[in-house]
Design a protein with these regions (language model features):
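The serine-hydrolase catalytic nucleophile loop
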Residues: 35-45
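Gly/Ala-rich beta-loop-alpha elbow adjacent to hydrolase catalytic centers
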Residues: 101, 105, 109
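Conserved small/polar residues in nucleotide/adenosyl-binding loops
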Residues: 114-117
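N-terminal cap/lid segment of alpha/beta-hydrolase-fold proteins
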Residues: 1-21
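Catalytic nucleophile-loop/oxyanion-hole region of alpha/beta-hydrolase
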Residues: 66-91
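Short beta-strand element of the alpha/beta-hydrolase
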Residues: 25-33
Length: 117
């Protein structure tokens, strides 16, 4: 069974995450698509694949998606980018990571990365 957790983005705003920490030197970060969540085939497959190959895995649901805070219609690209940056900084810190994105996530990945530095 997959265990999802929450991380506080702000005082009362929780983001749902899936973080499989296996003490690897690399973390695969999966960013889902628009109006999607982490319970689909792609994130669950990647999580299983990473566990099997002893690689850390991280995914999150942006604001207004899945069980994270907020309503979808109030979300913005900037807000979702900030969600991604926050989770990467908080969980991965300075470790190496590889971003894999689907649909919107494929766009948020590079946009978030350029704002991490």
């Amino acid at each position: 069974m997959t265990k999802f957790n929450y991380i506080y983005f702000k005082k009362d705003k929780k983001l749902r995450i899936l973080n499989s920490k296996l003490n690897s030197k690399l973390t695969v970060v999966f960013l889902h698509g628009l109006k999607s969540d982490m319970e689909g085939k792609k994130p669950l497959f990647l999580n299983r694949y990473c566990k099997k190959n002893k690689v850390n895995f991280l995914s999150l649901e942006y604001a207004g998606h899945g069980k994270s805070y907020g309503k979808f219609e109030n979300g913005t690209i900037s807000q979702w980018r900030n969600n991604v940056k926050f989770v990467i900084r908080k969980i991965i810190k300075k470790e190496k990571f590889l971003i894999i994105g689907s649909s919107l996530g494929a766009w948020l990945g590079p946009v978030s990365y350029t704002h991490l530095e």
